[in-house]
């Protein structure tokens, strides 16, 4: 279910402050965050945000195509190692 339009997008207030600080100073410092639920706004474009995936911080460079998506979408939490295959498959 989508978020109500009258509420607007959720962005963690500390993350918003850090991005604004980076933009006004002209720095490109990496911003670390645990807020995977924060929506990417146009202010974030051009910034690198390190999003926590439960184990480590995954750097995400924000482009215009990412606006409107959530940060967690670009930092996978599960690593798929493949299904178990049959041993000696095809050998006779």
UniProtKB/Swiss-Prot annotation:
GO annotations of cellular component type: cytoplasm; small ribosomal subunit
PROSITE patterns associated with the record: RIBOSOMAL_S19
GO molecular function terms attached to this record: rRNA binding; structural constituent of ribosome
Segments of skewed composition (Basic residues): 80-92
Pfam family, one: Ribosomal_S19
Alphabetical keyword list: Ribonucleoprotein, Ribosomal protein, RNA-binding, rRNA-binding
Disulfide bond positions: none
GO biological process entries: ribosomal small subunit assembly; translation
Entries under InterPro entries matching the protein: Ribosomal_uS19, Ribosomal_uS19_bac-type, Ribosomal_uS19_CS, Ribosomal_uS19_SF
Alphabetized Gene3D superfamilies for the sequence: 30s Ribosomal Protein S19, Chain A
Ranges for region Disordered: 73-92
Family: Belongs to the universal ribosomal protein uS19 family.
PANTHER family assigned: RIBOSOMAL PROTEIN S19P FAMILY MEMBER, SMALL RIBOSOMAL SUBUNIT PROTEIN US19M
NCBIfam families the record matches: rpsS_bact
Function: Protein S19 forms a complex with S13 that binds strongly to the 16S ribosomal RNA.
UniProt-recorded name of the protein: Small ribosomal subunit protein uS19
Gene giving rise to this polypeptide: rpsS
């Amino acid at each position: 279910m989508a978020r109500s339009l009258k509420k607007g997008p959720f962005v963690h207030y500390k993350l918003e402050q850090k991005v604004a600080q980076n933009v006004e100073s002209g720095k490109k410092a990496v911003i670390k965050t645990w807020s995977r639920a924060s929506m990417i706004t146009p202010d974030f474009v051009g910034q690198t945000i390190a999003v926590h995936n439960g184990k480590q911080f995954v750097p995400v460079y924000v482009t215009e195509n990412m606006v409107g998506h959530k940060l967690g979408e670009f930092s996978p939490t599960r690593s798929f190692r493949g299904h178990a295959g049959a041993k000696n498959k095809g050998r006779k």
